[in-house]
Amino acid sequence: MAMTYTHEANPTAAWLTLTRPTARLGASPTQLAVLAGLILGLGFGLVLVPQGTLGLAHSAFAGLFVAASLIKIGTVALAQTFETKPASLAPRNASLPVYSILVPLYHEAEMAQQIVAALKALSYPRARMEAILVVEADDHATRKALYAARPPRWMRIMTAPDGQPRTKPRACNLALAQAKGDLVVVYDAEDRPHPNQLLEAAKAFADGGPRLGCLQAPLHIPNCQGFFARQFALDYAVQFETLLPALVRAGRPIPLGGTSNHLRSEVLRALGGWDPYNVTEDADLGFRLAYSGYRTALLRLPTYETPTRSFRAWLPQRARWLKGYLQTLLVWTRAPGRLNLQDQIILWMTLGLSVLSALIHAPLMVWLIFQTVFAIMGHPASSWALDLTVLLLGWSTTGVAMWAGARRTGFAVKPADLVLSLAYWPLASLAASKAILQLILRPFHWDKTPHQPEALRTAP
């Protein structure tokens, strides 16, 4: 039996955490004053000139949807110019950089066998790699399951000491303090990275120069069934095969995915590690890299993920993402001069639009349904045709983005997927509402996403 051991993580790893900029500080007095002014202005407007205020809000919402649709088409067009050469791999020899694989785990006993098998399938010299599997102190079931999976010597099981906030980035920082690698990658419990992904990343870092700080592997969802699973897969196809390639092609920062981020360890340490108070530490890190003058590029070899398959699993995960986007927006608008104008636009185009569009999906859909009913009864509202046009524009551009992204991943899009997206979008408003409530009441709470193991997919 391969020997493993539990290494008690060093609490002094706190030096890796950020003091500024960090989500720990919340909203600044200036940000709170601006928000209060907007709310008061809207309230006075509704009391004094309700019709005009509602009309202005309606126009703003419609304009937001049109802008999002045009941006989506623009990113699809730009992504088509992104060069997709076959993956170039580094030779498997003793000159390869040492790789540290960080795997934060919490209540993942069912996934222990799968993640150990997925890491063992990586085609990288064992003498040049290590894996640190971080388990919380009270998570005895996951620790026991990891031992039962018989991990080899190059996999270490680390126990994170009790502490707050209990988040994934905190666990990653504790592991980073013990990591020996020149390069670092983060994987989640449900991840199944392509066996050659580390070799591709090592080659890309060697060729990319010292200012290449990060490589993002695409996250793919294999063809699956079920409403939430398929919509989730198409979300990923749009994100990783249209939006991110377009941003990289334009030379702009990207909001990193929550896993399969490959980084130079010296760069990551110089940046202070991950912000343990940000529940989308990946999105924040993408902008922090750009602010510090580092580039991010994309890999071709993917990581296969397991989608959320039910509303009960989807809602807290999506709410956590949106809460983290809000945290990141607060961090990077606290002192707007940190980012140049172009990167500020990207910040709002990616994270800001995601939150705002999620908030207004359901209200706009309900409003349109009421207008349609009145139109059928012979009393069409003056804005009904405009609202219907806005919806159809958003629907069609989303369909184009879904098709373009899915075509690159091999995911088979069905006409029903596009039709059912009309029922999927309004659910984002529930997630956005929960995100805002949690940002106020439980800003650093990490909603855990449950996972179920799947048979390992053989990478093409």
Language-model segment annotations:
Residues 279-285:
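Acidic donor-binding loop at a coil-to-helix junction in glycosyltransferase catalytic cores
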Residues 43-72, 76-93, 350-441:
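Membrane-embedded multi-pass helical conduit in multi-pass membrane proteins
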Residues 97-100, 130, 269, 284:
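Cell-envelope/extracellular polymer assembly enzymes that use nucleotide-activated donors
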Residues 286-304:
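Catalytic donor-sugar/metal-binding loop of nucleotide-sugar-dependent glycosyltransferases
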Residues 120-163, 206:
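Acidic donor-binding segment of Leloir-type glycosyltransferases
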Residues 147-183, 195-279, 319-330, 424:
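Long helical/loop segments within the catalytic core of UDP-sugar-dependent glycosyltransferases
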Residues 188-192, 274-277, 289:
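The conserved acidic donor/metal-binding loop of glycosyltransferases
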Residues 69-128:
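N-terminal signal-anchor transmembrane helix
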